[in-house]
Amino acid sequence: MMIQKKVGDRIRELRTQTGLSQEKFALKIGIDRTYFASVELGKRNIAIVNLEKIADGLNVSLSDLFKGL
């Protein structure tokens, strides 16, 4: 499995634990919803700055995003 897909799956797993939809979460962290959806689907290479926004929005560390990959 490609790393983008693994990271996207991990982000989706953590986001669903928050109870927020993609749309509400993307709005919370200031990222376009369609971009965020493509990240979760593993279709986008994501910039580190956006990984930081996602981690902050999930209240996890960057290393937590990569746990189990």
Regions found by a protein language model. Name each.
Residues G19-S38:
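Short alpha-helical DNA-recognition segment
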Residues F66-L69:
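Short, charged recognition helix plus adjacent turn
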Residues M1-Q17:
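A short, Lys/Arg-rich alpha-helix, primarily the initiator
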Residues N50-D64:
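DNA major-groove recognition helix of helix-turn-helix/homeodomain DNA-binding modules
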Residues T16, L27, D56:
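Alpha-helical residues within the helix-turn-helix
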